Every structure is written in C-alpha cells, then in structure tokens.
Amino acid sequence: MIVCLDSGNTRIKWGVHDGVKWLAQGAVAHAEVGALSRLVAEWPLPEKVMLANVAGVEAGSRIREQLAAWAPVFHEVRPELRRCGVTNLYKSPERLGVDRWCALLGARSLVDSATVVVMAGTATTIDTLDADGNFLGGVIMPGIGLMLRSLAHGTAALPFADGEYATYPRCTDDAIVTGVIDAQAGAIERIFSRLDDPAASCLLSGGYAEQIAVHLVVRHRLADNLPLEGLRHLALKS
C-alpha cells in the first residue's frame, strides 16, 4: 500500500493506493492537520509514504508528527533533471516547485502526447510538456480566488464579486467574474497555441479546474489530483 501526500498552499491532499487503483482520497486544511491521524486508524502500515510539500518546513514537520508512529519513513520528493519519462528543462531543475514537478509526472503517466498541464488552485500554473516528455517551461499567475480578492482589497469601489460568467457582462459582479475567468482561460489557450501540435491536449487539475474548463475552446479534460498521480507513479517506479 502506498500513501501519497501533497502539502499545498492551502490544503493537504492525501491518497491511498494499492498499486492498482486508488482506495481513498481526501483533503484537510493545514490548520486541521490532526485529521490525518484517521489514516492511522483506518489503514494498515503502508509500504511507502510519498510527500510533496510546498507549504514550508513547519508544515512538513506537523505532517510527519501526525503519522510518525504509523509511517516512520517518508520519501520526500524533490525535483530532478530526469524521472519517469519527464526531462526537466528548468534553468535550475531543483528550483522547480515540487507540486508542479509531481503534476508533470502525473500528467505524463496519463498522456504520452504533448500536453499543457494546468494546476488551478491558490495559484494557477500552466506548464508545457512536448511529445518527448520535455518540460519546456511554464507560467505562474494568481488563481481565481486571489484575483477576485485582489480587486476587492486593492480598490475602493469594487466588491468581492459573487457574479456569474457572461458573454457581455452588464453588472459589476458579472464583469469581475467574467474578466477573471477569461484571464485564466485566455492564458491557457495562448500557451496551448504555442505547441502547434495537432495531437496536443490539456489536462486541468485543482480546485478551480472545472470552473475554468467549461470556458476553454481547446481540447482538454479534467484530471483529479495530478500531483497525487505523480507521487503514485514515482512510488511504483522506484
């Protein structure tokens, strides 16, 4: 049994895998890290525990403390130059965010063609894999929630919008929501167009993925918890 933990900016996503399929997945807020103890109560000792952590040393330590008696050895993943069919062409490969690295590995395990890999969470990352598995690079932009909050907090007159997407928005809340979603979808489509590959696809994961996906005009599909898929793939290949 493999346990995969993706410690992100907002939540800790977890998954239990038996080598063939996911048995369970879930998420807890960092403030509720104690809830991870239910893994100890509900599951037998794992063969491997895989951890990807972008939330800092303290967050990683709290996770380890909760699971120490049950999983004394953690395999904490670091970005590498080459692994599982992905070549990391970042200027300094080790400085790529481990969440992005795991998402790329997860995407490559699901699709062997050129792929735009989108993680739509607190931040939105849009990364490109070519058909040979080379990570060409990517962009980081504020996620939907951050964009909405920045307009509410950074202006005197604009609210925290609770509007709906509209082709031609005719109220302020709709105008804000539409602008934010169009910014996200437009960035994805712009980067997708650079691939110039008729077989290319786009994978979207993260809390805002579905909200963006319905407005995309490029070939795409949703993929649950791509970083967990990457951790799973690493565990099975190592």
UniProtKB/Swiss-Prot annotation:
Chief place where the protein resides: cytoplasm
Domain of life: Bacteria
CC cofactor note: A monovalent cation. Ammonium or potassium.
Listed cofactors: NH4(+); K(+)
GO molecular function, one term: pantothenate kinase activity
Catalytic activity: (R)-pantothenate + ATP = (R)-4'-phosphopantothenate + ADP + H(+)
Keyword Membrane assigned: no
Function, as annotated: Catalyzes the phosphorylation of pantothenate (Pan), the first step in CoA biosynthesis.
Protein name as annotated: Type III pantothenate kinase
Source species taxonomy: Bacteria, Pseudomonadati, Pseudomonadota, Betaproteobacteria, Rhodocyclales
Gene that encodes it: coaX
